[in-house]
Amino acid sequence: MSLEKDKSTVINNYKLHESDTGSADVQIALLTDRINQLIEHLKLHKQDHHSRRGLLKLVGRRRRLLAYLSKKDNARFRAVSERLGLRIKA
């Protein structure tokens, strides 16, 4: 249940309009939240290679979404990256 509450708060923080649940901004924010949870999990469970592979897949998906957003709307890309604390190439 707590994951759904976390997910809904992330969606509410990053949505572009009232019924927005799938824009690139929201998807990137949700992936970043899940990535951060997996990083914390892997700090405790260093030998969990299945979760590590899942983490790498999520990072790749987020990277592709960020590349799409940077091509489509660079201002939104920079705003989302800054808001989430992501490092971007200069």
Swiss-Prot record:
MF-aspect GO terms: rRNA binding; structural constituent of ribosome
Listed GO CC annotations: cytosolic small ribosomal subunit
Residue ranges of the TM segments: none
Family stated for the protein in its record: Belongs to the universal ribosomal protein uS15 family.
Purpose of the protein: One of the primary rRNA binding proteins, it binds directly to 16S rRNA where it helps nucleate assembly of the platform of the 30S subunit by binding and bridging several RNA helices of the 16S rRNA.
Pfam families for this protein: Ribosomal_S15 (PF00312)
Top-level taxon of the source organism: Bacteria
Subunit structure: Part of the 30S ribosomal subunit. Forms a bridge to the 50S subunit in the 70S ribosome, contacting the 23S rRNA.
Gene3D superfamilies: 6.10.250.3130, S15/NS1, RNA-binding
Protein name, as recorded: Small ribosomal subunit protein uS15
